[in-house]
Every structure is written in C-alpha cells, then in structure tokens.
Amino acid sequence: MERLNMTKKIMLDPGHGGHDPGAAENGLREKDLVLKIAKKTKTILEKVYGASVKLTRSTDVYIDLSQRAKLANNWGADYFVSIHINAAGGTGFESFRYDKLAASSSTGKQQKTVHDFIYNKIKAKTSDRGKKSKNLAVLRETKMPALLTENLFIDRKEDAVLLKQESFLDLLAEGHAEGIAAAVGLKKVSSSSKTSPTPKGVKMAVVKPNADGWLWVYDKPNWSAKHKKVKPGEAFTIDKTVTVNGSKMYKLKSGLYITAATKYVQIKQK
C-alpha cells in the first residue's frame, strides 16, 4: 500500500504527429524520433521506478497543443515532459520551462534536475545549450510542473548521425527517465525490497497479473531492448540475476531477460 501512495503520474508528450511531422531532415522526422524516445522513457519509468505513465499520443496521430495540456490536467499528472528535436541551425541539448517561472522556482529546480541527468548521459557526444524559459502552450496551459526538451538538431549532419543510433536514443530515454524520477522523488522499485538468497534447484520466474495484462521480456540486459510481450502466468527458467542501472533482471535460460521486480514476477521452484 505504501508504494502505491508514493507512485507518481508522469505524462510524456511526444511532439507533433500525424500530418505534422515536426522538423524533418537527413532522412529523419521529428515526430518518429520523439515517439520512440517517449516510449523508451515510459518503459524505464514503469519497470524501474514503478511510475504510472501515460503518453499524449502512442501512435502517429496529430493532437493540438491545448489538448495535450488538457490530457495531463484531466488525468491529474504530477509532472509533464514534452519531448522534441530541434532544427534551424545549431547543435546540442536544451530544455525549457514556462517563462513566468524563475529558475529558483520549484519548476525551475526540477528543470535543472532533469536537464542535468539528460545532459550527463550525452555530454561526451554533444554540447549543452542551457536551461531556458519560453512562453510555450504546453508549458503555459499545464497545471502541474512542466518541461520541454529539445534533443539535438535534426538538420545538423553530426547530430543526425547520433539520432540515427538506437544506442543514443537509449541514452536520451535513460536520461529523461532518471531525471524525471529524481525530480519527483521516485526511487527504484528494487531498492525497497531486499533480494533473497538464491535457492538451489531450478527456479522459474512466473509473470504476475498486472494492469497492462502483459510484461516485456528483453533481448539483452537493457531496459530499452524490448523483445516481445508475455502474459501473466507464463513461466521462464532463470539462469542468473544481473543488475541493470541499479535494478535487477533475470537472465533466462532462453537467453532473454525479464525484470526481477517482485511487483511483476514471482519465483517458483520447478
């Protein structure tokens, strides 16, 4: 019950969509990239931090700016992040808060937290354009603390090379997820439960019932390397336990990986 009380509602907003591709250059479209980053971020926030996460859009559809804010307001989100890719000359990463809010405000402090987490993931590959403020609709019309990120420049060849790499999108997603979790006070779900000593014999990880009705298994020990969905009740033979970004995963006999969080799986002896 205590964990439920601590759960935060996070609304992720992949910019553009449908007839609005956003910026497009170098064989890339902003609307596709930001949706991919948002989905990866959602997975990490849910599986690693136990957050309740929604996307303003999960497919290639157009939603106007006021409706995006309304979705977050009506849900009662605790935090809102709109994800974008920049254009029109330049390079690097930057973030925005509503311009009526000072850097010293609570929203400004949360901006600093999320911004720094993201930039620290990618600083070896790009530059920091700073923590900025602007009168943007999704920042102005949302009732909760809100942030907009601009993740490199789609029309700069060097930035586009990075944005074409799945591993770089993983870094952006990790930065967003870890930064958001830190900003709203979410802890890793594994940190609240001690790992029991591994019993001898063959162990099975059995998927527990959950609100989604499914759980991801992964190709490798990486929360973004999703392979397929499995259903509650499905059981998998455990090979060993590994630690990924501070949280536990089970490596399965099949070579795939699954979360070790007791919220999602239970262990049974074969």
Where are these predicted regions, by residue range?
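Active-site-proximal helix/loop segments of hydrolytic enzymes
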Residues: 2-9, 32, 36-193
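Catalytic-core environment of secreted peptidases
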Residues: 7-25, 81
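A broad, low-specificity signal marking well-ordered, structured residues that form hydrophobic/aromatic
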Residues: 10, 93, 146-147, 205, ...
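Pocket-edge structural micro-motifs
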Residues: 14, 97, 151, 219, ...
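Acidic glycine-/aspartate-rich tracts in secreted/extracellular proteins
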Residues: 18, 153-155, 256-257
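Short acidic, gly/pro-rich beta-turn/loop elements at beta-sheet edges
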Residues: 22, 91, 105, 159, ...
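Glycine- and acidic-residue-enriched helix-capping/strand-helix junction motifs
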Residues: 22-36
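Beta-loop motif signature
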Residues: 194-251, 257-270
